[in-house]
Amino acid sequence: MLSGTSYLYGLWPPMMEAVRYLQAYASVYSLEGRIASGLRSNQEQATLYAQGRTADEIRRQVSKRIGVDVVTNAPPGRSAHNYGLAVDVEGRDQTKLIQLGAAIGFATVSGDPAHLEWPGWRSLVGL
C-alpha cells in the first residue's frame, strides 16, 4: 500500500489522478511505501534548499558540495513541487514504486531516487 494521502492536497488534478493510479497499482502488487511530499510552498522549498548549504552558496545557487547532504537542487519556484506537479515516495519498496511510477508515465530525476514528476512540467508553468 502506498499511503500518505494528505500530500495529495494541492496537486494539479491530473497529477493527483495519476498518483491515485500509482496507489492502486501499489496495492495490487503489495508494495509498501508512502508519499512523503507533494505540493510545497516557496518557503518550504527555500528551507529544503538551504539544508546543507552556506548562505553564500544559497546566494550563488550552488547545486552540490562534496561531503554535504544537500536535500534538493531546486531553489524556490524552480521545483515541480511548487506547482503540485511532483511527489516524493519513500519506504520499504521505494525503488519498485519509482520504477512502477516511471512505467505508468511519470518522469524520474537522475540523482533523486524518491522523486516522481509530471513529464514536461516546465512547459506547463512557463519555465
Descriptions of predicted regions:
Residues 1-127:
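Cell-envelope/glycan interface and biosynthesis
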